[in-house]
């Protein structure tokens, strides 16, 4: 059974994300910019914690996976070799009534018809024509469209084109990060001590000229990928693939704390010609189950293509057997933004407090929370309380992500920290200073999830908060 979600959950998450500084529409003072978003002060911390968790799980927890940070701009032939120049496209149609441009596969999906991503332009148009009376424009509601045309998603740039002479052809902002890994395969092999099987991990920005911008940060034109390409002997690819499937599913439950019932597997029935297997881990977003991470057995296609187009030998010579071969690749690929949205969705909770009040709380795992501890003086107009609170704050910030807050009454401060997802709030009051001799040197610690409060000695605070 999946967790029941209110119909307006997406709207509530978007509102909270802006109100509490997680996500802002980009360039909002100019009216915004479709499918482009900025992380605010708490969003950037949550995103960093997600990156760090992924990097630890993929790189630091393995002795045969190394990191890479490849450039966003690459030689134009990289994208020819990868197939992006000729085949990286979505089917586009224009509404003849309001001139809105929309993805045909999304229009069909809205009426329960699913178009295979490998369909030719002719095939997608035949399917589109078959269901044209049911398909409605999302903007004006009419059913009057042009034929579908394939629209390339690569974002073209004028980089280096000072004279208008495109000697190398147009340059692009990268459409995916993995190509930077493939073209550096030989460099990593030659400069480090890795041997097959080994992996290369990378986190970085990618860009796609998406036709339809929707579903908040789930589908963006500028987004961040976290990918690992694992190079193996062809005979070990199938076994390795299953091992990584298990590891990656467990990661979301055990490391990120997502509820297992909100995750499921989806197998690709129709594979691209070079792929041997492709499964997605799907998460139950407010708009339904959608892809969170893809795990793919890509065979030797990528290294073979780049070897051919670059005229560079990208084969591997096994030092033990002297066998020479092109390694196969097992890929794990996830979007940071989608992970961010999944973590935010899973954490979002509304709870009744008393008979009439409702509190909103983000129940992040402690290690992901943007702020781990908030420190309050009971009153901001009492210098002795503020001074002691600052002292506690400065001590705790050596080991925790800490925020100091003295605005408003303590109850309102609690609610604000609940909406930020802060696991603990520490309040310095007059008992801390010795008004009650039996409580001198103690503080009140309030737990986010239970709302229970406990007195803890200042010298024991660090140990208590780490428990």
Language-model regions: role of each:
Residues 1-467:
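NTP/phosphate- and nucleic-acid-binding module
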């Amino acid at each position: 059974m999946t967790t029941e979600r209110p119909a307006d959950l997406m709207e509530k998450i978007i509102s909270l994300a802006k109100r509490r500084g997680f996500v802002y529409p980009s360039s909002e003072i100019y009216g915004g910019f479709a499918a482009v978003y900025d992380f605010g002060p708490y969003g950037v911390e949550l995103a960093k914690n997600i990156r760090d968790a992924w990097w630890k799980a993929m790189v630091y927890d393995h002795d045969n996976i190394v990191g890479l940070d490849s450039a966003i701009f690459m030689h134009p032939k990289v994208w020819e070799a990868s197939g992006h120049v000729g085949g990286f496209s979505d089917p586009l149609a224009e509404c003849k009534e309001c001139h809105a441009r929309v993805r045909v596969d999304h229009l069909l999906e809205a009426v329960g018809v699913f178009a295979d991503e490998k369909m030719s332009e002719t095939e997608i148009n035949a399917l589109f024509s078959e269901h044209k009376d049911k398909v409605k424009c999302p903007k004006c509601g009419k059913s009057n469209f042009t034929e579908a045309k394939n629209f390339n998603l690569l974002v073209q740039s004028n980089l280096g084109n000072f004279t208008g002479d495109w000697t190398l052809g147009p340059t692009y902002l990268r459409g995916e990060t993995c190509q930077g890994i493939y073209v550096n395969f030989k460099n990593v092999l030659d400069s480090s001590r890795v041997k097959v099987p080994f992996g290369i991990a990378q986190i970085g920005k990618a860009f796609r000229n998406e036709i339809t911008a929707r579903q908040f940060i789930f589908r963006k034109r500028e987004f961040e990928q976290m990918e690992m390409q694992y190079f193996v002997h062809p005979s070990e690819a199938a076994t390795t693939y299953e091992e990584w499937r298990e590891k990656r599913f467990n990661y979301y439950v055990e490391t990120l704390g997502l509820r297992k019932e909100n995750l499921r597997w989806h197998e690709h029935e129709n594979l691209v010609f070079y792929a041997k297997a492709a499964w997605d881990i799907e998460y139950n977003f407010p708009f339904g189950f959608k892809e969170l991470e893809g795990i793919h057995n890509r065979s030797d296609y990528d290294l073979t293509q780049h070897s051919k187009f670059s005229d560079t030998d990208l084969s591997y010579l096994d030092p033990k057997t002297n066998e020479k071969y092109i390694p196969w690749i097992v890929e794990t690929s996830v979007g940071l933004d989608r992970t961010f949205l999944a973590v935010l969705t899973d954490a979002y909770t509304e709870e009744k407090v008393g008979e009439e009040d409702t509190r909103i709380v983000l129940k992040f795992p402690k290690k992901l929370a943007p702020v781990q501890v908030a420190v309050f003086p009971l009153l901001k107009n009492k210098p002795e309380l503020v001074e002691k609170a600052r002292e506690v704050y400065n001590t705790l910030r050596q080991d925790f992500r800490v925020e100091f807050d003295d605005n408003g009454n303590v109850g309102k401060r609690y609610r604000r920290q609940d909406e930020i997802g802060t696991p603990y709030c520490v309040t310095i009051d007059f008992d801390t200073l010795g008004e009650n001799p039996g409580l001198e040197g103690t503080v009140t610690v309030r737990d986010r999830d239970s709302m229970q409060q406990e007195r803890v000695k200042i010298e024991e605070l660090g140990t208590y908060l780490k428990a």
